[in-house]
Amino acid sequence: MDRWVLGFALAVSVVTSVVFGWAPALHASAKASEPLKKSGRGLTGAEEGTRLRSTLVVAEVAMSLILLAAAGLTLQSFVHLVGSNLGFNPDQVLTMRVLPPSSRYKTDEQGIAFSRQALSGIRSLPGVQAAGTVTFLPLSGWWGVRSVSLQGKSVPEDQRPIAPWNSVTPDYFRAMQIPLIKGRFFEERDDERAAPVAIIGQSLAKRLVPNADPLGKWLDVGGLKKPAEVVGVVGDVYQLGPTSQTIAGIYLPFSQVTAPILCFAIRTTEDPSGVAKAAQEAIWAVDKDQAVGFVMNMSQLASEAVAPQRILMQVLGLFGGMALLMAVIGVYGVIASSVAQRTNEIGVRMALGARSGDVLRLVMREGLALVLLGVAVGLAGILGLMRFVSSVLYGVRPTDPVTMVGAAFALAGSALLACYLPARRASRIDPMVALRYE
């Protein structure tokens, strides 16, 4: 999230809260300290002041509702994101990345030998269940594409559909727990001497052969001299996170299609951090000069993938809470001011037989009218503004009725509680004291 945008939003929210919340409350306090000193001559001015404060409170309630609804939507969105299926299991997976220098690994055979020896050493470590390598690790922010089409279709390569690709070793799918839909995973026999093979994701399979079995089909893949046979279909993996439409499409065996990047995925039976040092030493046992970087748990990457949504949720939650507090203060201030101005009227009503409950309901109705008007304006504002936040939501509609109703009830309930204090005070006024009140 851009820090300037965040700072600007914070400043606007604070200023808005102060203007719409504290201003009415402070004004009400001033009025309460010298009530109706100018009961005759100042009547028009008092009425204008009341209308202004009421208008400000209605605006505050409306803006508070919009912020509360936005906070509720982002909270639901974040919950959906955290629980979303990435296409693999990030728990208990250690990752690290190496870039074998071309000065020492001049041929494909040398790169293949390095990966096999390093993986063999890592798999022998206590607590390691499976280990494999991949070119572009999911959620790392790195990805690449290749053109891909069914063999026999006369489509120029620059016009073929493109799909994210990865070069992987056989145990990669087991290490990441990517589900096999049909066919098989890569095996050691799928080496540089064997016929080219490929595994494709479920979505790509539906695109290429929507009404047929993709197994056994041959694909023309960009960069490959020969067609590759589809030997397996796996579940979709969200390469850049659940909010992205970038889904891993085609997997090629590292033994047949090498790459200058090797990202290790190591599934462990215990805390992955506990085997990090030993895994690095297993790589250095093959090449003591090989730099090893990007050492972290896959669950940490998964957490970072939803970090922008987490920050947005926290910011809007903070702003929503501040706005709710200011709305409550504003409503309290206006009702307290109204009670102070109407002390004589209340005394007359009670002298003529009005009961405490009647006065309580009278004052509460005044507060309820302001709150309901603010809620109505806020709901109208939500319908007009929420479509602009749809791009940052996941798994929830911008106009989710449960969120709207929940925010409205939370705001209305809090505001009515703020009305109750001055209303109760008004219901306990002594009529004789109120009639002498000037």
What spans do the regions from the language model cover?
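Membrane-helix entry/capping segments
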Residues: 1-11, 41-57, 147, 256-261, ...
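Alpha-helical transmembrane segments of integral membrane proteins
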Residues: 1-105, 393, 432-438
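Hydrophobic alpha-helical transmembrane segments of multi-pass inner-membrane transport and secretion
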Residues: 19, 49-77, 309-344, 372-373, ...
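Intracellular coupling helices
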Residues: 30-43, 329-370, 428-436
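Mid-to-C-terminal secondary-structure elements
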Residues: 74, 113-308, 314
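Transmembrane alpha-helical interface segments in multi-pass membrane proteins
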Residues: 323, 344-390, 406, 410, ...
